[in-house]
């Protein structure tokens, strides 16, 4: 393991895969990825009611970090979102590890040959900070996790149409600016009897 690999270990990995980072640790790690590579940029797409930035990472091999430049590049645009329900943190930790591997391992950089990635590690930033060990008691880890709804007690995953939440209003503006070709929304089950560790569903 190289010195850079050690430097870029995620909070989740350092904890022995038992703990997920809080908001401050997550944003700090996002900025570390930005500083460690020219192909990842940290920005935000809005601010939550409690004043937290809504973090966004952009990964592009040719530093196309605007909607206009991505469109001109001809790349497919992939939007990956995690922690719309902050108790379901697997997507956040996996996404940060994926971007880390892309910038630190040459064999992964080919993933960006024809694709630009937008990654939202935490959508519901305020609910994310209501950390507790009993928020999803039937779920297999992490030791503590965030709360399902926002500071205004809104479920963002039920707000795409009515857009009551300031977070969703910011998300819709961001989505319409970027117009991604493919959208992955990461969730975690809290005890349902799925036959596989990872599953996916496609809306058609």
Question: Which positions does each model-derived feature cover?
Answer:
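Soluble metallo-hydrolase cores and metallopeptidase-like ectodomains found primarily
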Residues: 26-80
């Amino acid at each position: 393991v190289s010195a850079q690999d050690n430097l870029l270990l995620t909070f989740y990995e350092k904890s022995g895969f038992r703990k997920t980072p809080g908001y401050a640790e997550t944003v700090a790690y996002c900025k570390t990825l930005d500083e460690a590579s020219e192909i990842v940029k940290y920005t935000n797409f809005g601010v939550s009611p409690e004043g937290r930035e809504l973090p966004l990472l952009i990964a592009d091999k040719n530093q196309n970090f605007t909607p206009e430049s991505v469109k001109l590049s001809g790349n497919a645009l992939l939007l990956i979102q995690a922690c719309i329900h902050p108790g379901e943190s697997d997507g956040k930790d996996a996404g940060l590890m994926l971007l880390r591997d892309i910038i630190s391992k040459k064999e992964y950089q080919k993933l960006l040959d024809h694709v630009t990635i937008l990654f939202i590690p935490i959508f519901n930033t305020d609910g994310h900070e209501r950390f507790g060990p009993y928020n999803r008691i039937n779920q297999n880890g992490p030791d503590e996790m965030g709360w399902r709804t926002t500071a205004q007690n809104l479920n963002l995953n039920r707000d795409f149409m009515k857009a009551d939440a300031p977070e969703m209003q910011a998300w819709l503006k961001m989505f319409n600016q970027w117009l991604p070709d493919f959208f992955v929304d990461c969730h975690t089950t809290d005890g349902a009897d799925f036959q596989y560790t990872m599953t996916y569903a496609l809306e058609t």
